[in-house]
Amino acid sequence: MITDPIADYLTRIRNAIRARHRIVEIPASNLKKAMTELLHEKGYIKQYKFDDQPNKQGSIKIGLKYNPGTKTSPINKLERVSKPGLRKYVKASELPSVLNGLGIAILSTSKGIMSDKEARQMKLGGEVLCYIY
């Protein structure tokens, strides 16, 4: 049984990037789907596909993106911030800036999963799930 599904999600992506895999398959949940859509929207992953099966959990297949010349990923680090044992909540005025705007913080807000920039524009605070840069 996985006690922290977000940490598992980030670890699977991190390990696949280090092993230079093109595709990584992850057990699906609504939170992971929203995070995957955000990563695609921000250009960190190439593509994704949700394999929903009736009466089963389903999975998410993520196509990882690499620079053709240097063969490096746009994702250098995936860092879990809010953990099950210690949640990290921030107000709209205290939203973090990751690498002076070069990275993103993924937040869970009352309006759903969004990046720090979107939350700043909407003046929303929430739980800081992770940093990606």
From Swiss-Prot:
GO molecular function: rRNA binding; structural constituent of ribosome
Keyword Ribosomal protein: yes
GO cellular component, one term: ribosome
Keywords from the UniProt entry: Ribonucleoprotein, Ribosomal protein, RNA-binding, rRNA-binding
Single GO biological process annotation from the record: translation
PROSITE patterns: RIBOSOMAL_S8
Listed InterPro entries: Ribosomal_uS8, Ribosomal_uS8_CS, Ribosomal_uS8_sf
Subunit structure: Part of the 30S ribosomal subunit. Contacts proteins S5 and S12.
NCBIfam families: PRK00136.1
Family assignment from sequence similarity: Belongs to the universal ribosomal protein uS8 family.
Function: One of the primary rRNA binding proteins, it binds directly to 16S rRNA central domain where it helps coordinate assembly of the platform of the 30S subunit.
Descriptive protein name: Small ribosomal subunit protein uS8
Organism: Amoebophilus asiaticus (strain 5a2)
